[in-house]
Amino acid sequence: MADTTVEKLATEVGKSVERLIEQFSQAGIKKGQADNVSEAEKQQLLDYLKKQHGGDNAPTKMTLQRKTVSTLSVAGNGGQSKDVKVEVRKTRTFVKRDVSDAVLKAEEEAKAKAEAEAKAKAETEAKAKAEAEAKAKVEAEAKAKAEAEAKAKAKAAAEVKVTKDTSPEAEAARIEAERLKAAQEAATKRKQAEEAAKAAEKARLLAEENSKRWAEEERQRLEAERYSDHHITTSKVARAAEDSSDMDEEKRGRRARNKNTAKTKRGGKDARDGREKHMRNRSTAPESMAHGFNKPVAAVNRDVRIGETVTVAELAHLMAVKATEIIKQMMKMGSMVTINQVLDQETAQLVAEEMGHKVVLIRENELEQQVLSERDEEGGVKLEPRAPVVTIMGHVDHGKTSLLDYIRRAKVAAGEAGGITQHIGAYHVETENGMITFLDTPGHAAFTAMRARGAKATDIVVLVVAADDGVMPQTIEAIQHAKAGNVPLIVAVNKMDKPEADIDRVKSELSQHGVMSEDWGGDNMFAFVSAKTGAGVDDLLEGILLQAEVLELKAVRDGMAAGVVIESQLDKGRGPVATILVQEGTLRQGDIVLCGLEYGKIRAMKDENGRSITEAGPSIPVEILGLSGVPSAGDEATVVRDERKAREVALYRQGKFRDVKLARQQKSKLENMFANMTEGEVKELNIVLKADVQGSLEAITDSLMGLSTDEVKVNIIARGVGALTETDATLAAASNAIMVGFNVRADAQARKTIENESVDLRYYSVIYNLIDEVKAAMTGMLSPEFKQQIIGLAEVRDVFKSPKLGAIAGCMVTEGTIKRSAPIRVLRDNVVIFEGELESLRRFKDDVNEVRNGMECGIGVKNYNDVRVGDQIEVFETVEVARTL
């Protein structure tokens, strides 16, 4: 029998894969989505779920009730017929003998009987041992006495010198002694036999007594099972609901009985007749079967329109019922939900149909699916080989651009010596063995976006490593990107013409990160090239084509095109321009393109050399004009038939993007972190921490980690010494973290990323303020926040000496306004080195209260003379910000 995967098992039981994997983990089994599940693991999970939901004890008796409703047409008065509903109820009871209890009782009986027999045997052996010891003692005394008598006789015989005693008195004494000895032995044996018989009788009586008691207990258990009732539902919630219904029914019967009893307490003959009638009614039918008249209420069946997701409260509003009714219905179906819990479309459909309503399913992206399904591929499934798409990666100054320039000059025709426009970021070259498409993307942003969206636009990664520099941080990052995208990696060792080139060092450093050359037993191809002389470039291209043959890259050439956006920009004269790498089909001028959040009709197409073209096949990069806006790098581009529908899909995607952006703004900030704790799981507050010195960093880290509780955990995902960089901001945005700067500031690139990603950035100068505010956020009782707002920034251009004031900084105000009354900080390389106040603020020898942006001024810092050229003087003010939950 084939093994069942976790994904297939989740489909069978009607649960999500994530929920099933979580239940496997709780049961002590680690599984992934594609892992197989054995029968033993299924049984282990079932036992764990039964234990969690109180389903360990299987029912020994269950009652099934079946109700059938039919309609009978009955002739009425005046020849008119009317429909009468006939309801038939059937009850069947099934009794399951509990074999485990009988086996347990039998084991207990055998154990008790064995214990009784062992006890009796031990007592008998102890008594026999004591008697044997007494007998041995008597025999020893008799033997000693006999020896003494023998010695006395021998002495007497020696004295009288008689060799044989033939006197009758001696013979009689000997015979009497033998008789007494035999009688004593017989009495001892008889006594032992009597004791053994008594012990055996006692053990038999004890076993008989226990057997009667066990039989009585078994009879009582069977009698109790005979009159007991077990429900088929093992869920605690469902049993509680049924028990509550039974109690309500019993209370109604009790109230009816009390009412009848109250009527009969008036005395006399009527009271006696009432009691007799009451007893007769009790004997004939139970109270719950009494007939009554209820005003008929027609059930309203509605058409419920259900989207992809809906909450319990929204579903109740759609069906015009209370939310508690839906919660009860879900409890009967074996699921425990809350009023704000989100239900998937299938679950909501089952609940609505169970409550008698008609369900109309709504697909929110139905139009998008319809537009994409209308794409026909004229070539059918005919696949043809295509050129490989190669991404060049490497550390800065390792010769990546030089290598690309040499390949371009060597492989592009002489008439195209002008080369390509570098901002396009993609081009293809023709070799003797085939065509290769290169992606020249600065950094790894486009590659990461494409990998995250599953576009698989890159087939091979060429890692450029300088032979004289070795592995650097961006080299390691490129290796991680290639491994995460499951893309083959070819290493190009550049700068081989330099005398400092060390091949073994490069191989050794790369092997530490999982990249092994074929010479060392690995599977990564190494090419040793020189972008300056061109040595080894042909070998690199042959290696790329060889790897492409192994991958067997194929694509559909005919039909409507589909691709991915490599780069996009807004040109002042041409409008939105997008560079698209065609992955399948043929892209033609005049096609309607749906590209992420944008759409449009292709007005013009250009290749990487800037020449106009009319069509482009697979693995060909092309520039297109005519989109409604600038798409994002990594968006999928698809050719559709109808421009009106393409516009509707683009508008729908823009609306969804706005919803996602609003949701991202509710990420883990200090103001709403405690509000996110809606479930009983442990929440994490992610923090990116930067400080000015290592000592402060360690102190803050230890203090923050000590704030972790059972409900909230502080997780410092990155920490370091120095200014906040763009890498820190990107990491904080990806992990929903807050950025904390202790006496450091963020640079310009980091501030831009922080603003675009809406990352929460905090500056502190006192460790106690940092700890207290994080603690206040974790407890959910945040006091009003005093925020330091930077109002001006001045750059020191020159330093003058004053006999009265000391060092005077000649500054240019670059941002905001410098005020005399506001406190200041002195920054050197974006690190706070002094915090104080202004002593003097002058402009053209005149004291002024403030100096605005773009003006020069002289600043004297109180109690600080170590001002240097290039320092920054930051002016801030403390403002109170009302905090909302």
Curated annotation (Swiss-Prot):
What does the record give under GO molecular function? GTP binding; GTPase activity; guanosine tetraphosphate binding; translation initiation factor activity
For whether the record's keyword set contains Ribosomal protein, the answer is no
Among CDD domains, the record links this protein to: IF2_eIF5B, IF2_mtIF2_II, mtIF2_IVc
Q: Where is this region: G3?
A: 440-443
- Which Gene Ontology terms describe the biological processes this protein takes part in? translational initiation
Question: Segment G5: which positions?
Answer: 530-532
User: Which InterPro entries does the UniProt entry name for this protein?
Assistant: DNA-bd_dom_put_sf, EF-G-like_DII, EFTu-like_2, IF2_assoc_dom_bac, IF2_II, IF2_N, P-loop_NTPase, Small_GTP-bd
Alphabetical list of SUPFAM superfamilies matching this protein: Initiation factor IF2/eIF5b, domain 3, P-loop containing nucleoside triphosphate hydrolases, Putative DNA-binding domain, Translation proteins
Give the subcellular location: Cytoplasm
User: Which Pfam families does the record cross-reference, listed alphabetically?
Assistant: EF-G_D2, GTP_EFTU, GTP_EFTU_D2, IF-2, IF2_assoc, IF2_N
Region feature (G2):
419-423
| Annotated spans, Disordered | 123-289
Using the record's annotation, list all stretches that form the tr-type G domain. Answer: 385-554
Recite the UniProt keywords alphabetically.
Cytoplasm, GTP-binding, Initiation factor, Nucleotide-binding, Protein biosynthesis
Query: Where are the annotated segments for G1?
Result: 394-401
Fetch the NCBIfam families from UniProt: IF-2, small_GTP
Mind telling me which HAMAP family this protein's record contains?
A: IF_2_B (MF_00100_B)
Q: What does this protein do?
A: One of the essential components for the initiation of protein synthesis. Protects formylmethionyl-tRNA from spontaneous hydrolysis and promotes its binding to the 30S ribosomal subunits. Also involved in the hydrolysis of GTP during the formation of the 70S ribosomal complex.
State the family named in the UniProt similarity comment for this chain: Belongs to the TRAFAC class translation factor GTPase superfamily. Classic translation factor GTPase family. IF-2 subfamily.
Name the UniProt record assigns to this protein: Translation initiation factor IF-2
